[in-house]
Amino acid sequence: MANVLVVGGGGREHAIAKAMMASPQVSTVYCAPGNPGMIRDGIRTLAIDEMDFAGLVNFARANTVTLTFVGPEVPLAAGIVDYFQAAGLAIFGPNQAAAQLESSKVFAKAFMSRHHIPTADYRQFHELDSALAYSHEQAVPQVIKVDGLAAGKGVTVATSHEQAAAAIKTAFKTSSTVLIEDYVAGFEFSQMVLVGGEHYALLPTAQDHKRLQDHDRGPNTGGMGAYSPVPQITPAVIDQTIATIIEPTIAGLKADGLSFEGVIYVGGILTATGVQVIEYNLRLGDPETQILLPQLQSDFYQVIVDLLQHRQPHAQWQTTATYLGVVLAAPGYPGPTEAGVPVPTVAGADYASVAGTPDQLVSAGGRVMMVTASAPSLVAAQRAVYQQIDQLRVGDLVYRTDIGAKGMTATHD
């Protein structure tokens, strides 16, 4: 029987750990650092920080961990995979060189240009005045991006030149390189794929909701909810995404000498002229993972082991239901949040920034939990989730009431 270590402590890692626990080959799932909400599902949490690579390697060796799965982007960008590989331990995730596809927007844009992968035109700037001058000459809307990792909050779609100038000034406070990108109109979606060398397993499509408030108002967040599959993303669109983006990305990594075992997450947009890449992430999305992995009907542990050994995995996904999840966050999110706010306990939820005990959880950060449901249609799945939330004592926690609404423009219950 196998022991699995999941690195991270959020709702995504809770879902990954539950999927690993469902494997008949797995005896124990550890999560470092995890959170108290995970303990409710029999996951063993560890007092080891996700950036303490030496501590994680020592634990993996001492507890005969056969597979480590990395959830968040920050340890990947810092080289956790290289560290584990140097210690001879099996780990699923991109090495530090490949992780630049997410950790540097400039690296990603150059990669897409080199390998003819469709994406918006852009210019990069290293000093404020030239960026402001260029922005002023361009039409709006325009997209301002920080080069490095920004927890999903490093992008501004500016609808006026004044807003663009303010975003550029803010961006240069945290980054030495800023990108100004042409705005592309279309329908956004997430397409993730588990990759091992030239082999891959495609996940169902998903759409997350980045803005804090209903009708896509308010500030950007890490994500306030998601649903899957996305009705507007037809089999023909998926085929186009595979042919023009996913397979060229996998081939491009190989051509550039970047060995790859991990997740490629395409933040895609369906435009009038086809699918384009908005951004790459090299890890599973949060909150999408929480409504994607429950759709897997195969052994998740075996899928990952096969990919690590560069074998084609058997990954079967359900095709008859829609899965939908709503994130609940502490008051103040995505700004400074109130700690110690009571968080309801409910079976099946995925917990994130919580403290306390498994039976008495309290907020310890921004997003605290995600409530999910599945049903034969998107409308029914949405209804089921909000009925669950209505029965919880959510108190001062904040959440959106319209998750899934975008998908309904193409569906009827």
Swiss-Prot record:
Which co-factor is required? Answer: Mg(2+); Mn(2+)
* PROSITE patterns in UniProt: ATP_GRASP (PS50975), GARS (PS00184)
EC number, as in UniProt: 6.3.4.13
The residues covered by the ATP-grasp domain are: 109-309
Per the UniProt entry, what is one GO biological process? 'de novo' IMP biosynthetic process
Recite the UniProt keywords alphabetically: ATP-binding, Ligase, Magnesium, Manganese, Metal-binding, Nucleotide-binding, Purine biosynthesis
Q: In which pathway does it act?
A: Purine metabolism; IMP biosynthesis via de novo pathway; N(1)-(5-phospho-D-ribosyl)glycinamide from 5-phospho-alpha-D-ribose 1-diphosphate: step 2/2
Gene3D superfamilies reported in the protein's UniProt record? 3.40.50.20, ATP-grasp fold, A domain, ATP-grasp fold, B domain, Phosphoribosylglycinamide synthetase, C-terminal domain
Enumerate the GO terms in the molecular function aspect.
ATP binding; metal ion binding; phosphoribosylamine-glycine ligase activity
Q: Which N-terminal residues, if any, form the signal peptide?
A: none
Q: Which residues are listed for ATP binding in this entry?
A: 135-190
Q: Which Pfam families match?
A: GARS_A, GARS_C, GARS_N
**Keyword ATP-binding attributed:** yes
| Cofactor, how bound (note) | Binds 1 Mg(2+) or Mn(2+) ion per subunit.
Classification via InterPro entries: ATP-grasp, ATP_grasp_subdomain_1, PreATP-grasp_dom_sf, PRibGlycinamid_synth_ATP-grasp, PRibGlycinamide_synth, PRibGlycinamide_synth_C-dom, PRibGlycinamide_synth_C_sf, PRibGlycinamide_synth_CS
Spell out the HAMAP family in the cross-references. Answer: GARS
Alphabetical list of NCBIfam families matching this protein: purD
The protein depicted here goes by the name Phosphoribosylamine--glycine ligase
Q: Which organism is it from?
A: Lactiplantibacillus plantarum (strain ATCC BAA-793 / NCIMB 8826 / WCFS1)
